[in-house]
Each structure stands twice: as C-alpha cells, then as structure tokens.
Amino acid sequence: MNETVANNKETRGFQSEVKQLLHLMIHSLYSNKEIFLRELISNASDAADKLRFQALSNPALYENDAELGVKLSFNEEHNTLTISDNGIGMSREEVISHLGTIAKSGTAEFFSKLSQEQSKDSQLIGQFGVGFYSAFIVADAVTVRTRAAGLNADQAVLWHSAGEGEYTVEDITKESRGTDIILHMREDGKEFLNEWRLRDVIGKYSDHIGIPVSIQTRVRDEEGKETEEVKWEQINKAQALWTRNKSDISDEEYQEFYKHVSHDFADPLLWSHNRVEGKNDYTSLLYIPSKAPWDMMNRDHKSGLKLYVQRVFIMDDAEQFMPSYLRFVRGLIDSNDLPLNVSREILQDNKVTQSLRGACTKRVLTMLERLAKNDTEKYQTFWKEFGLVMKEGPAEDYANREKVAALLRFASTEVDSAEQTVSLESYVERMKEGQDKIYYLTADSYAAAKNSPHLEQFKAKGLEVILMFDRIDEWLMNYLTEFDGKQFQSITKAGLDLSQFEDEQEKEKQKETEQEFQSVVERTKSYLGDRVKEVRTTFKLANTPAVVVTDDFEMGTQMAKLLAAAGQAVPEVKYIFEINPNHTLVKQMADEADEEAFGRWVEVLLGQAMLAERGSMEDPSQFLTAINSLLTKG
C-alpha cells in the first residue's frame, strides 16, 4: 500500500457518547454482525460520490485515477480484512472529527431511549446510524489509513483503536488517495476471512452500489486449482439501482437500497419508484420507513432526499424537495434539469425545485392514500409512527390540505378506544340527517376527552364527536377549518347550537325554564363579577351541573396550555359559566336564600367546571373551603 510512518503521533480519548455507542453496538448487534460490511461499503460509496461532486469544479482531485471503486482483501494468517476505496479521503482534522466524535444533535436524547432490550436497542441503534463504528462488532482493533484528495502524500493519516477508551492518530506518507480500513478480526469474526462468505454478503447488501465492489481472489489453473497469482474480481452489478427498469428490480433489492440510503436496519413500509419525462426529466425513488426516526420531533433533525443531477451525487438531506410534515420520507431524486454546480441556496428559489417538490409531495400523498384504502392495518402501523407529524400538514401545505386531511386519523365517540382509527371521510358518511358540522373536542388525554361533560347531549342525541388529545390538535384546528364542505365545530365553544336536533315542544320548554331561571343567573353573575365573562343557562348537559366554555373567537383551553408549555405569554382566558337548570345541585343552589351559602354553591359548581375543563384551578383552597362548609352544613 506504499505507506510509511512519519510522525506527530498523539493519543486521544473518545467522546463519551462514542464509548457508550461502541459498547451497546457490540452487544446489541452481535446477532446481525454482517451489517458491518454493508455500513463500511456504503461509507466507501459515499466517499466516491463526494469526490465526484468536488471534482466537478476541480478535476485535478482525481489525480489521474478517475475509476472509482471499493476493494476487499483478507489475510487469514494475520486475521485481517481490509476495505479500501479511492474516494475523497480524510485530512487529520476530519479523521479526529469523524472517527472520534458523534457529530449529531440530540445524542443524549438518543441514549436515553435505549431500553437494554436487545431487539429494541438494535433497531434504535440502526436508526441512529452506526456507520464506521460497526467495524467493532467483528474486530477487536481497527486501523485506518487515509489521505484526502488534493493533499500531498506526506499529509496522510493513520488512525488506530481497540474500541475502548482511546485512539491514536499520527501522520504517515500514503501515495494513493482514499481510505483503507483494516479490521483485526475477533475470533468470532473470522468467518468473514472467507471469499465465499464475503461474496454472499456483498451480493446481499451492495449489488445496488453505483461503483464496482471487487474482491481479491486467487487465479485458478486449468485444473481449477488455486495458484499464488491474485486478481481483482468485481462482485456487484455497479449500476445505480434507480436507473434500472422497475420490472428488473426485486423487492429485496429495493429493501436493501433503502437501508443503504437511510442507514436504517428495518425494511421500509412501502416505496415508489418513478421515471418522469416531460416538462421536467427526473427519477424519484421514495420510501416510507416502517419506524419513525428516534429524533423526528427534534428541531435539528436532518431530513430530506439524496440529490443527484444526471446520476452525479450532489448532496445529502436536500430538504427542499419535501415539505416538513413529510420529513420522514427517505430516498432520492435524480434530476436532468438542475445544474451540476447547484447549491442549497440555488435550490431554495429554483422553479425546477418547486416543481419537483410539488410532484414528490403528491407522489407520497398518493402512496399513502392507496395504502389507507387497500390495507387499513398497514396504514394504522404508519399512523402510529408518523401521525403526529402528518398533523402538521394542513398548516404547512395549503394546496394539499384536503388530501392531507383525508389521511388524518382520530379517536371518536363512535369507537370505544383511544386508538386513532377514524377518518374524516368515515365521520362524514355517518353524519345524521340535518347535521352540517363536524363536531370535535380537544382535551389533555383520551380519558379526559371520553368523560368530558360536554359530550352528554351529543351522546343523548346520537351525534358522533371526534376526540382529540394530542398536544398538536388544538393548533391543528386553527388551520383545519373544513372538510368535504363541512365546517368543524368545537363542542366547548359558546356558539354551539344543537337546536336543529330538538322538536318545537322541547324548545318551548327550554325557553320557559330559561326565563324562570333568569334571576338565578343574575345572582350568580353578581357574585362572580368579572371572574367570568358571562353566566347563562344551558340545556346541553344531562348529568353535570355546570361547565365553562369560551367564545367562538377566544383562545381555547388546550391552545393556552400549548402556548404556556412552549414558554410563550398567554392572555387570560375569560370563560362563560353555563349552569344546568335541570340538575339537582343547581336547583339546591337556586333555592338557597342565604347569600353567603349561595356563594359557596357557586364556588363549588364553578370549581368543578374549571377542574373538568382545565385539570386545575387557580385557588383550590377557596374551592375546598366552600365544599367543607356545605358538607358541614349538611
């Protein structure tokens, strides 16, 4: 390999997260240890992609060696397996940065999710992306020799570690550009010091890699016996998978390519591969993962597609081709219309980009529509993983609001379960005659929603109510105002009107009761003063004495909680206090002549209503004093 040791050797400690990852990986991924080869070959392929990209503006980086590839060789006598590439290579600073630290945000959050349960942890670690560190699954020591393209031969670097607490790094001379990774195999890793085992793994994981992957093999004589002469034999097809005809690609190949582009260990849920010719010429290969990325809700989560231009790799995580609510989509887009020197800044305001973004978005939504229609169970698997981010869609993607809304799922009073299985389409199909609104309720939890006093009249009248209890739901409903021509109506708002479901006799009786009860309403308002916006009677309740509601255009309880949790200033919510004149406790309050005792009744009923609505009250002691006083009197 033409390397000679130079100088400037130093010993450095691993970042603490690296130590933790190495330990967990060796134990959690042991049963699937062959993935180390997929990871290392994938990294080598990425290094070739990066060299191609940089060489577009600086062809001298090829150093008269533009035939890029990956080569594997092994030495049974020395127990070593070597993976070599002639890609971009690394400088000393890059070696320390890439091989000594984990340059990811949210690393601590990732480790906190680990359960010490092997199957779950291996899945999480796979999502995190182990890359280079997977070498330690089969090796008790790893040596890296690398030189960055464009640097002098004497600016190469040697990195070595036994995968424990530290590593060494030193300057060497290396004539060839690129990286050699030498694995000093463990006893239980020696199965990979075998040509046929390596062929099997490469065929399984790396057929789709766009550069040749070759293995060193002995030349056989005329009788078929091995000689001392060796040659390099290409093992993979070395054709970019997305450039092949769909009919020639097996499901297994699509699945392995997904693992290559996503560094996920699990198979994808579904995918879509399309070649489009016309106004824009491009190929897209889009995958829906089966599991949500562990850091999907992290603001710094990197998302986006791999971008190729005319089959030349340009960048990872090109987020411009997918809206934020579809940030879980993995895959690539290969455009013939973008310039090869395209940058993230150019992509931002590019008409081609906007056109491709619209097309890719519609492609993903169509995939999900078909899944929801044809495989309800599989769609529920998707919803459990990605439902929360899909609820960001109506606010972000006005053009596709109706499409996204049709994909949303909720709990409802129709289904006695916290599972979010009800579509808006199915709700509309079940609407009663005369019903022109979609009724919904937001709450802190399913239990709070299911047992809300606001539901009583809806249950009595057989009206279905959508139950929302995700933190994002109240925010969502600011943007999702109608579906299929039907307006949404919160059942906790003052403007709720169910009169179309009541007969004339019932309406007349309510009017009489309201007039009879007017003096009680005025006494209550006089006692409470400006603590509430208004006091009035309600006939929407059956078993509950009182509730609080907000005006149609005033901030609701759940939105106030959402803003407070985000650390934002929240204006005071002024509630309307509604009392049920048919309830025994309200009648007792109405019959109370003593104003002090009447006030205690008001405190108890308002306290109950606030507790049911908000889950808390501003002055619990006042509430308890009123209860104790009434109980003592009783």
Swiss-Prot record:
Keywords: ATP-binding, Chaperone, Cytoplasm, Nucleotide-binding, Stress response. GO terms for molecular function: ATP binding; ATP hydrolysis activity; ATP-dependent protein folding chaperone; unfolded protein binding. Residues 345-561 are annotated as: B. Homodimer. It comes from the Bacteria. It is found in: Cytoplasm. GO terms for cellular component: cytoplasm. Residues 1-344 are annotated as: A. Molecular chaperone. Has ATPase activity. Disulfide bonds: none annotated. This is Chaperone protein HtpG. InterPro entries: HATPase_C_sf, Heat_shock_protein_90_CS, HSP90_C, Hsp90_fam, Hsp90_N, Ribosomal_Su5_D2-typ_SF.
